[in-house]
A protein has these predicted regions:
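Nudix hydrolase/Nudix homology domain
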Residues: 1-33, 164-207
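Long alpha-helical scaffolds
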Residues: 10, 17, 37-40, 117
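Unchanged
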Residues: 99-123, 131-189, 205-206
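Acidic, metal-coordinating catalytic segment for phosphate/diphosphate chemistry
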Residues: 27-30, 34-73
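N-terminal strand-loop-strand
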Residues: 56-93, 121, 125
Length: 207
C-alpha cells in the first residue's frame, strides 16, 4: 500500500481533530480530539521520517475550523523567458508564497515578486487555480490542504538582492528550465504559464 493513502487518512484525522477542538466544550472530548491530532502527526512522522516536532509545527498549530491555505505564484515572463528564483535549498521556483491577510490574490503576487526576485511587476490575469495535493504534493507536506493560484505577470523593472528566502534569480526559456525545480511548481504548471503568455484568449485552468 502506498504512502499516499496514509497521508490522506492522516489529513482527514487532522481535519476532524481540529474541528472538534474548535467546537467541543467538553473537557474529555477535547482531550480525545487532541489525541487524534497527535496520532495524525505520528503517522506522518513515521511515513516521512521527519521529526515529530517538525510535523507538529506544520500541522498542529492552527485553531478553528480547518480550511485550505492559499499559495500565490508569480509567472513573470518577458521576451519568451520566465523569471525563477533559487531557494536556500538549491531548488528553483516561481516567486511566491502564502497569501497575506489584507492583500488580494493579485496584490500578493506583486508583493512576492518584489520580495523574492526584486522585480516590479503587474499581475495581468490568473493562469490556474490548483489543488496542491492533486498537482504538486506527493510528500508529507501534501497533507496540508493548499490552493495554488498562478498569475501571469508583466515585468516592469527590478534588481535581484539575496534575501532570507532566495539566493539567486534567472531568466529561462521553457526548454532550458533548471533541473532542480521545487515541488512548489511543476514543469506542467510552468508550461501552462507560457501558454497563457502566448495566447491572449487563454482560459484559466482550475481543479
Amino acid at each position: 500500500m502506498s504512502n499516499e493513502i496514509f497521508i490522506k487518512w492522516a489529513r482527514e484525522l487532522q481535519s476532524i481533530a481540529q474541528a472538534g477542538l474548535h467546537y467541543s466544550k467538553d473537557k474529555f472530548e477535547t482531550e480525545r480530539f487532541e489525541r487524534i491530532r497527535n496520532i495524525s502527526a505520528e503517522m506522518l512522522s513515521k511515513i516521512s521520517n521527519e521529526p515529530i516536532d517538525k510535523i507538529k509545527d506544520i500541522f498542529c498549530c492552527e485553531k478553528g475550523y480547518q480550511t485550505p491555505k492559499v499559495d500565490v505564484r508569480s509567472a513573470i515572463i518577458n521576451e519568451g523567458k520566465i523569471l525563477l528564483v533559487r531557494e536556500n535549498n538549491g531548488l528553483w521556483s516561481m516567486p511566491g508564497g502564502w497569501a497575506d491577510v489584507g492583500l488580494s490574490p493579485a496584490e500578493n503576487a506583486v508583493k512576492e515578486a518584489f520580495e523574492e526576485a526584486g522585480a516590479n511587476v503587474k499581475a495581468e490575469r490568473p493562469v490556474a487555480i490548483h489543488d496542491w495535493q492533486k498537482n504538486n504534493g506527493k510528500n508529507f507536506e501534501s497533507a496540508v490542504s493548499v490552493y495554488k493560484i498562478f498569475f501571469l505577470c508583466s515585468y516592469i523593472d527590478g534588481k535581484f538582492k539575496e534575501n532570507i528566502e532566495t539566493i539567486e534569480s534567472g531568466w529561462f526559456l521553457f526548454d532550458e528550465l533548471p533541473e532542480r525545480c521545487s515541488v512548489k511548481n511543476t514543469n506542467e504548471q510552468i508550461k501552462l504559464c507560457f501558454e497563457a503568455y502566448d495566447d491572449i484568449n487563454f482560459i484559466c485552468r482550475f481543479d
